[in-house]
Amino acid sequence: MKTIKILSILLLLPTISFSQIQYGGAPVDAINIKEINFITIDHSNIINNNLHPMVLKYANEYSVDINVPHLATKIEGANESTYYLGIESPGAMALAFIFDEFNLTENTKLFIYDEEKSMHIGSFNSKNNNPSGTLSTAVVKSDRVIIELTIPNIELIDLQLHMSIVTHDFLDLMNFHGERTADRTDCNDNVACSSADDWGDQVDAVVMVSGGGGVCSAAIVNNTAFDLEPYIIYAAHCNGGSSTVYFNYQATSCSGNNPGNYNTMSGTQTLAVGNFNNNDYALIKLNNDIPGSYGAYYAGWSRSTSSPGNNVVGIHHADGDIKKISYDAYGMGSSGNWWDFAYSSGRVIPGSSGSPFFDSNKRIRGMASYIYTDYCSPSPDCYCSQSYYHGYAKFSSAWNNIDDYLDPINSNVYSIDGTRDGNEAIYGCTNSSACNYDPDATNDDGSCE
């Protein structure tokens, strides 16, 4: 380990409009890049994740054995030291990391940033510790990324920071370099379009989940206690490994190709999972509560076995893209544990998998599972030029394995509405000038006279 003594603190780094749960501050950045020890990833150590074809593969994962403080360049101070370690994976559009031993001490600060210093994530500190002792990060732009760790010297003995996997993004998943702009004008509407105006709450329930070098879509889901437990439901074939969840990854205009501010969280536990060949669902839970600043909506659901009809919408991250909406369903049918139907506007494609469709009551009825067509080019164009049916795993078929979590009060209800704040919706006339105005109503039911 290279040790350098230095007295000054230099520049603060700029950030892009993104946040993982982090705790402020900026990297020390008190070293010349040329002084940092860089580790080049051995691409022969690739992990074969054997992803399902409905999972969008955006990255290769490589197995590593990296004890960060042992291999880092150290800047030693009288009371605290800062460690810098560079990770290089040639050709990557972005890099992400999985730490299989992650236990930061009380006064530790961890940042991760690109060599060009155009973005950083962090700080991470002891509040990011979790019972699993692991952490997966969001992607950071560049194929050369720096890990910076500042820790009081007396706390070093208690630190655990070991990296086991490097995720090499070859697709430019988050469009840092503009490589995917052409793909973003597909046949699904942006959720900022007027077609999504009546579905704003449901839009805010849908998230993107990355793990194992692939991405799927999913939904934050409510439970009968209305207690804002951070449950997420998606497809069994998406589940596995360390996950990072992306919130609000969506355009701010109907024709926009790039997102506004978005947020991420990492660290999940699997609560219930089916066999994707006959019951394709998985219920997971984030290790931490979702911050109120993320504006999340906890979607309602229905376990009814009756047909939802054709007035349904799907909301999803098709091709790992900014959030989209599909609508005008036709041919609604039932086949075992699946609902089968097509969309007149929009298509489910890899990356959409696990996403919810909502019935006319704006409740989840199923999770995207498969498509009745051949898998083709990574570009959405080849899917948009076809007309085909989609298979959604029935929410009702998963119920017997998820009811302990989604009905913790044993109400045995068949459906509930969603919530933002833990309060149940009260339906009535919300027009204060109407003769039957209900001052307690939170949702207008169309009854105003």
Give the ranges of each region predicted by the language model.
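Bacterial Sec-dependent N-terminal signal peptides
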Residues: 1-24
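Primarily marks secretory-pathway-exposed extracellular/lumenal segments that are disulfide-
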Residues: 14-19, 416-449
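A short aromatic-anchored loop/beta-hairpin motif
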Residues: 20-88, 168-187, 192
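Short, surface-exposed beta-strand/strand-loop-strand elements in extracellular ectodomains
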Residues: 103-118
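Beta-sandwich interaction modules
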Residues: 116-146, 150-155
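Serine endopeptidase catalytic core focused on the charge-relay Asp
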Residues: 140-215, 219-341
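Catalytic nucleophile loop of clan PA
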Residues: 219-229, 346-368
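C-terminal subregion of chymotrypsin/trypsin-like serine protease catalytic domains
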Residues: 232, 258-265, 274, 358-425
